[in-house]
């Protein structure tokens, strides 16, 4: 499995951008997202493909999770992680809450993959094959009693059933993913009965099944309405993505699953992320688009100057005229000045301390580019005059 992930610091940074663009809304339209996406200076066709990949639910808008996906894809492209937009969304970038949509899409296009699961303990001694989905009347009655004693006002279950069962956490996670592919915080009665049946059979020595009969899965997903308004208000952006601030535990995957499982059941931390109004443009990061683009423009300017010098030297037969040499010195001095400004911006020195923006430097580079173009035109006109003078001299010699 890939070690890549969207870090908590990235999520908080993306939230600042999302909150400023959405004006308190939950989704971004194409018009709202266009300014920040086009600021990357990627081609329009690339941005269109990134939008298609990020818009997992195909509703024509981006919610916060989808916006995070789009931003990470853009940053990876700008910084050379990808040569082009990937044909499919990498598994590590798929939002957990939308994994079922991606799986359905891949199934329709012939690229179906399984949901992320902890590996089955196939070598565990004593486990048997032959799991039977049939519930005996006595077992079903027992499951219904547990359900009735723990359901909430809407008839859903949101508590940790596995705490009283002698079942490994990895198997609990496999069973939960199996009956709850949409990663909802609560499950219905039918799904609860199936969940208890799977865990009961695992306790009796049967392996967790890998699939659910289609008819049974349909009953899990029928009439699923999200009443948990607090889930949208309380959960922080980092919590939505399963980020826990880098905490490590000695129990490895089981502990990680426990945290994810509690979060899915709505029993996670109560803290929430609240935008503090931080100016995102002042954030120091090596992945900042303006900085990357400025370095690229400086490299293009250097290449252009070298090209002009080579062309001038070729035309003059290796001789250096006073005017081109002066132009070169001026351009070199200007280039050194721009390099010093870039170093100051990267290190936080110079004008960057009082709020000088990379946008201003980019504007100055555009001005320099225009000056270079003007000097090239002037050089060509002077060369043309020189050629005309040479031609007049030759004509005068011939006439004599």
From Swiss-Prot:
Record's signal peptide: none
Which keywords has UniProt assigned to this entry?
Answer: Actin-binding, Calcium, Cell membrane, Coiled coil, Cytoplasm, Cytoskeleton, Endocytosis, Endosome, Membrane, Metal-binding, Repeat
The record ties this protein, via Gene3D superfamilies, to: EF-hand (1.10.238.10)
Q: Which GO terms describe its cellular component?
A: actin cortical patch; cytoplasm; endosome membrane; plasma membrane
What is the top-level taxon of the source organism?
Answer: Eukaryota
Question: EF-hand domain spans which residues?
Answer: 42-77
Topology term for the membrane: Peripheral membrane protein
Q: Which organism is it from?
A: Sclerotinia sclerotiorum (strain ATCC 18683 / 1980 / Ss-1) (White mold)
Q: Which gene encodes it?
A: end3
Show where the EH domain sits: 10-100, 139-223
Q: Which residues form a coiled coil?
A: 286-400
Ligand binding (Ca(2+)): 55, 57, 59, 61, 66
Instruction: Outline the subunit composition.
Output: Component of the PAN1 actin cytoskeleton-regulatory complex.
What name goes with this protein?
A: Actin cytoskeleton-regulatory complex protein end3
The answer to whether UniProt assigns keyword Cytoplasm to this entry is yes
Q: Which molecular function term from Gene Ontology is one that the record holds?
A: calcium ion binding
Q: Which family does it belong to?
A: Belongs to the END3 family.
PANTHER family per the record?
A: EH DOMAIN
Main subcellular location of this protein, as a coarse class: membrane
